[in-house]
């Protein structure tokens, strides 16, 4: 059996009037991440962690922000495709552990819905997906509510 770990990171600027997509669900808030797709930083970090563990480059390589096919796309579509790609190479996802850094909105009330959305997109059990959130204690661009960061680790196994 082969076991590999991958790390992913993403950041997006927050803009007034943009929808707030995080973890595959839309949250009510006055700002949202700005980007080429729906700018779901959590899913993008998870995609990079999975791709990294499989040594398959990164999300920008496979879904370039210069390609209009991905403009405005639901990031769950990207995650499903990443999972298909790694499974085609014989990998399975053991678990994903992710953290969000943002001041608002509060994430804890939404974690179970995020886990469900991600579980469906990745075809893995909810209990294999951990999501945590923290603030930046009002420090830096995250603390000023100008941006949101996401970090993720994925463990892949190849029987």
UniProtKB/Swiss-Prot annotation:
- For this entry, the protein name equals 2-C-methyl-D-erythritol 2,4-cyclodiphosphate synthase
Binding of a divalent metal cation, residues = 10, 12, 44
Q: Supply the source organism's classification.
A: Bacteria, Pseudomonadati, Bacteroidota, Cytophagia, Cytophagales
Asked whether the UniProt record includes Lyase among its keywords, one would answer: yes
Family (UniProt): Belongs to the IspF family.
Organism per entry: Cytophaga hutchinsonii (strain ATCC 33406 / DSM 1761 / CIP 103989 / NBRC 15051 / NCIMB 9469 / D465)
Stated EC number for the protein is 4.6.1.12
Its required cofactor(s), as named, are:
a divalent metal cation
Q: Where does 4-CDP-2-C-methyl-D-erythritol 2-phosphate bind?
A: 10-12, 36-37, 58-60, 63-67, 134-137, 144
Self-association state and partner proteins as the record states: Homotrimer.
Q: SUPFAM superfamilies from the entry?
A: IpsF-like
What is this protein's function? Answer: Involved in the biosynthesis of isopentenyl diphosphate (IPP) and dimethylallyl diphosphate (DMAPP), two major building blocks of isoprenoid compounds. Catalyzes the conversion of 4-diphosphocytidyl-2-C-methyl-D-erythritol 2-phosphate (CDP-ME2P) to 2-C-methyl-D-erythritol 2,4-cyclodiphosphate (ME-CPP) with a corresponding release of cytidine 5-monophosphate (CMP).
Instruction: Show the GO MF annotations.
Output: 2-C-methyl-D-erythritol 2,4-cyclodiphosphate synthase activity; metal ion binding
UniProt-annotated site: Transition state stabilizer, residues: 36, 135
Alphabetically list the UniProt keywords: Isoprene biosynthesis, Lyase, Metal-binding
């Amino acid at each position: 059996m082969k076991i590999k770990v991958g790390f992913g990171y993403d950041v997006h600027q927050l803009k007034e009037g943009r929808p707030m997509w995080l973890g595959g669900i839309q949250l009510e808030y006055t700002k949202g991440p700005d980007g080429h797709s729906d700018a779901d930083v959590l899913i993008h970090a998870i995609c990079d962690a999975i791709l990294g563990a499989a040594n398959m480059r990164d999300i920008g390589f496979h879904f370039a922000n210069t390609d209009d096919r991905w403009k405005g796309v639901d990031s769950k579509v990207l995650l499903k495709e990443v999972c298909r790609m790694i499974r085609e190479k014989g990998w399975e996802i053991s678990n994903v552990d992710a953290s969000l850094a943002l001041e608002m909105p509060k994430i804890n009330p939404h974690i179970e819905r995020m886990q469900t959305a991600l579980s469906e997109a990745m075809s893995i059990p909810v209990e294999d997906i951990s999501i945590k959130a923290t603030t930046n204690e009002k420090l830096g661009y995250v603390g000023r509510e100008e941006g949101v960061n996401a970090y993720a680790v994925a463990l892949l196994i190849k029987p």
